[in-house]
Design a protein with these regions (language model features):
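N-terminal, active-site-proximal structural segment of metallo-dependent hydrolase catalytic domains
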Residues: 1-52, 67-73, 258
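Alpha-helix boundary/capping residues
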Residues: 29, 52-56, 192, 231
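Active-site regions of metal-assisted phosphoester/phosphodiester hydrolases
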Residues: 1-24, 79-267
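Structured beta-strand-rich core segments of catalytic domains in phosphoester-bond hydrolases
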Residues: 33, 37-118
């Protein structure tokens, strides 16, 4: 099975011509399953994939949270294999940011963890507090731990390295959230029961999956895009397709997205 995870950077909308280019890039990679974040709802993107034989989940049937209402974007799954859409975990403030489906014997989730800790003025305006972000991380961990044969990938936002060198953490500004968040991140990224499929690609010398352009530490490397598996019986290879992030159009703008897609191949 070939799974492509990609934040297509559609939170503020994608013009139709660029949507067509992104779909063409996906078709060139030829994944069986596509896990998407920042899908612009009502803009025809999922319908464009459906025209090429991909069944898609329906994120707009879930309740609208404040963030989605503001940005009109969601996480979604598209599959050329038979797929049954499942409900997102209970307790999410933004259920449209967590799409779940069963494909064969595998349960797969596409998630977008709310961006809350690094941009406090924006977070406050949108009703996003660090606690909401931590809760989404907590639900992601509970979902992975809740059944065999589960795989989750998506944009986790705002990465930060632990001082002791463990793979990756996620910054929290409030002390009350920090310890709770790091415990959850340890469960996601550094546990024996969950495999961090792309953690070996996050050395400081490696190409990032996203350049952080704003906030307190702009113009630095970031690995926002992750894949995690709770199935020890299945091996996955992981490769970032950085060329799709670095590709530029004639105006020097990103041709596709400011995130590198992550290709997973299961054996």
């Amino acid at each position: 099975m070939r799974i492509l995870n990609w934040n297509i950077h559609g939170a503020s909308g994608i013009r139709p011509a660029k949507q067509a280019e992104i779909i063409a890039a996906i078709l060139h990679v030829s994944p069986d399953v596509v896990l998407l974040q920042e899908v612009p709802l009502g803009a025809g993107f999922l319908e464009g994939l459906a025209a090429h034989g991909y069944a898609t989940t329906e994120p707009d049937k879930h309740p609208i949270g404040l963030w989605e209402n503001k940005k009109k974007n969601a996480a979604a799954i598209a599959s050329r294999l038979p797929m049954t859409e499942l409900s997102p975990p209970e307790g999410l403030r933004f259920p449209r940011l967590f799409s779940v489906a069963r494909i064969g014997g595998l349960e797969i989730a596409s998630c977008h963890i709310p961006n809350a800790s690094g941009f406090n003025s924006v977070a406050k305006k949108l009703g996003l507090t660090p606690d909401i972000k931590v809760t989404h991380l907590e639900r992601a961990l509970a979902w992975l731990d809740g059944g065999q044969g589960r795989l989750l990938a998506g944009d986790f936002n705002e990465p930060d390295f632990f001082r002791d060198g463990r793979a990756i953490g996620f910054e929290a500004t409030r002390a009350a959230d920090r310890d709770r968040q790091r415990t959850i991140v340890d469960g996601l990224m550094n546990s024996d029961s969950i495999t961090h499929l792309c953690g070996h690609l996050h050395a400081k010398s490696d190409e990032p999956s996203h350049w952080i352009k704003s906030g307190p530490h702009p113009d630095r490397k970031g690995w926002f895009d992750h894949a995690l598996s709770a199935n020890k019986g299945r091996a996955w290879s992981a490769t970032y397709l950085h060329e799709l992030r670095s590709s530029r159009d004639e105006e020097g703008k990103e041709r596709y997205s400011d995130h590198s897609p992550l290709l997973l191949v299961g054996s």
